[in-house]
Amino acid sequence: RITKDGGVAVWVVGDATIKGSETGTSFRQALYFMDCGFNLHDTMIYNKTGLPMNHNRYEQEFEYMFVLSKGKPKTFNPIRIPCLYPEKETARQNSKYSETNEIMRKARSGKQRKPVGKDKIKGNIWKYATGKNHSTKDDIAFNHPAIFPEQLASDQIISWSNPGDVVFDPFMGSGT
């Protein structure tokens, strides 16, 4: 009832491990949101760094960030990052690169390949350092059992809203 058409909710959730098995609650929660009328607009990954090691399984280094929307999102302000090889010409996907073939192709088509720009839209796996002096400078936040980096919240808010928009935090910032 609170999210209007075009509005977005970002649900960050990880699975608990109980008696040696992951619970799968993250997927059940995403499906529940869909049953309530939300679209699952994107499934993103919050990749956590700086975690203690777990010795009986691969370390749980991520949580899901389900981007849920009422209809098509009204706003998308993509975060841009520098390209690894700016100004380099793009190669055709799924083909072996050969300088001779490239010269022949250009001669046949008369077209030059488009160079890659200096930046690109960030992918949907977002990496953040966690822990003391990384997630937040606010010591009281570390009393919360599920703290999230302030930058994660900021990046999601910037991505899905414009200045002056109403942003509702049902947890009142308790985890940031």
Show the residue positions of the predicted features:
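Core catalytic lobe of class I
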Residues: 1-176
